[in-house]
């Protein structure tokens, strides 16, 4: 199996790589050719990561490739984990962040189209994750949109922690905890589908929405260890047999307009795994008027981001 991690010299990659190469994601019987991509200024740091990987003698590592070249990175891969993006700097407007990441994810989408297989699965983590996923998907038309996902699992894990710590829920009682909408401060946490059918207080929802910012304030940088753990759980779930009927939160392409939500967007929705690397959106859950309005507000943010990206794309084409 050939796995690409972009932003390979970054903090999330540093926490993720041991999980990938020790068999905790794809299983201990799966040998991995790991490709790490980063930009030229980070190449020396990438070489240091390479040294540490070799010194760790991970049991699942078959081959390691470090590179700054898109062709080398994306050629013939099975899984793309897209961590690399432009971070939001102080006082940076959203449109400026979108413009920076448009350039990156346009190039990554084009590389997927040109060098990767149509069967490749893609997980986008770099923010704005949902819209970055949309950009990459648009530029890789040979790869089905259902093969692209963005990360909502970290928000779901934060909700699970809240249910355990505040409501004394067991692990089993946190099943079907869900995240809806955009991966941003507008996301909507939902515990109504758990076995206890909990109705979250507004302060609980705000806690989930602000958790990432709270980590940055305390740690001085964004979530890395918990993000890597969420990536592990997303991929492990996606590769599952489909025997577990529990719902999970994936950022997926809303081709069919589920729940009346806008089409042609990557939205965090409830899914179940049907067989390895395939999922089905659960489209028959009952949503209250208040919850649906909150989700629609979050999705409107995605609509606005998409329209801004379309302007950027038009400028490139012109």
Task: Please annotate each region the language model reported.
Residues 5-9, 17:
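N-terminal Rossmann NAD(P)H-binding glycine-rich loop of SDR-like oxidoreductase domains
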Residues 25, 29-77, 307:
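Conserved N-terminal Rossmann-fold NAD(P) cofactor-binding segment
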Residues 80-82, 124:
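Redox-cofactor binding/interface segments in oxidoreductases and associated redox assembly factors
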Residues 139-149, 154-318:
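C-terminal substrate-binding/catalytic lobe of Rossmann-fold NAD(P)-dependent dehydrogenases
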């Amino acid at each position: 199996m050939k796995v690409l991690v972009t932003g390979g010299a970054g903090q999330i990659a540093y926490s993720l790589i041991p999980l990938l190469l020790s068999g905790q994601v794809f299983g201990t019987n799966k040998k991995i050719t790991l490709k790490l991509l980063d930009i030229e200024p980070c190449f020396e740091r990438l070489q240091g990561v390479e040294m540490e990987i070799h010194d760790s003698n991970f049991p699942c590592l078959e081959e390691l490739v470090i590179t700054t070249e898109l062709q080398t990175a994306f050629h013939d891969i099975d899984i793309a984990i897209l961590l690399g993006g432009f971070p939001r700097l102080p006082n940076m407007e959203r449109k400026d962040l979108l413009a920076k990441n448009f350039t990156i994810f346009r190039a990554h989408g084009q590389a997927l189209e040109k060098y990767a297989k149509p069967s490749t699965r893609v997980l986008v983590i770099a923010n704005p994750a949902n819209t970055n996923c949309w950009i990459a998907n648009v530029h890789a038309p040979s790869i089905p949109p259902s093969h692209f996902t963005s990360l909502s699992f970290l928000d779901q894990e934060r909700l699970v922690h809240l249910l355990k710590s505040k409501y004394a829920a067991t692990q089993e009682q946190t099943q079907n905890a869900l995240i809806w909408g955009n991966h941003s401060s507008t996301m909507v946490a939902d515990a109504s589908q758990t076995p206890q059918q909990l109705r979250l207080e507004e302060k609980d929802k705000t806690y989930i929405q602000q958790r990432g910012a709270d980590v940055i304030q305390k740690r001085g940088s964004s979530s890395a260890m918990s993000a890597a753990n969420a990536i592990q759980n997303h991929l492990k779930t996606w590769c599952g047999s489909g025997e577990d009927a529990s719902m999970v939160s994936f950022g997926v392409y809303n081709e069919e307009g589920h729940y009346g939500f806008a089409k042609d967007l990557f939205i965090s929705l409830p899914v179940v795994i049907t067989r390895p690397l395939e999922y089905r959106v659960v489209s028959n859950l009952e949503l209250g008027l208040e919850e649906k309005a909150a989700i629609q507000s979050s999705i409107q943010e995605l609509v606005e981001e998409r329209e801004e990206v379309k302007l950027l794309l038009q400028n490139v084409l012109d």
